[in-house]
Amino acid sequence: NSLRLTLWVLLIVYIFNFLDRQIVNILAEPISRDLGLSDTQIGLMTGIAFAAFYTFLGIPIARYADRPKTNRVGLISVSLIIWSGMTALCGVAQNFVQLLLARIGVGVGEAGCTPAAHSLIADLAPPEKRASAISFYSLGIPIGSLLGMVIGGLVADAYGWRAAFLIAGLPGLALAALVFL
């Protein structure tokens, strides 16, 4: 039962992870129009700003997550606070630099999720159930990506791209508190 509950919580966290990661793609056009960004700036904001920090921080965070005394749940909660807060900050960005810095923050925060989650799953799931457990957790990728596109598009059409970032980011802060409990 503990493993099942943990997997459901981790799945929800991973859905938020990919929702916040992918929402920027559907919002690129209205952001570009509103802030007068070039295609190069959009590419930097949607790609390298996130990916470089996510990639380079993933390995050291994974090493930290694997330490025996690391509080993996706490690491996931802090990561969720960082990426959700930074996603919400994207919604109040007034220029390219602010948006770029917020997207870097999303990458930094999200870098801590998967290593800690995989380490936690490895601790809780017996070897014969680990592959299934990680597969269940990984369902967050397509579900979160889909929700990011759908929610992002619907909210942006109705209320603007800024509201889409706020609606995507702010609930993650509440989720982080629940995860930590």
Question: How would you describe each model-predicted region?
Answer:
Residues 56-97:
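Conserved MFS/SLC helix-loop-helix module at the cytosolic interface between two early adjacent transmembrane helices
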Residues 22, 50-59, 111, 145-146:
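Residue-level signature of mid-helix packing/kink "hotspots" within the transmembrane helices
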Residues 36, 69-70, 92-98, 109, ...:
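Helix-breaking motifs and short loop linkers at transmembrane-helix boundaries and internal kinks
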Residues 27-56:
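Extracellular/periplasmic helix-loop-helix junction of adjacent transmembrane segments
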Residues 102-142:
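Cytoplasmic helix-loop-helix junction between adjacent transmembrane helices
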Residues 137-181:
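Helix-loop-helix hairpin linking two adjacent transmembrane segments in secondary transporters
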Residues 30, 59-63, 154:
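Membrane-interface helix termini in secondary transporters
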Residues 1-19:
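Cytosolic juxtamembrane N-terminal segment immediately preceding the first transmembrane helix
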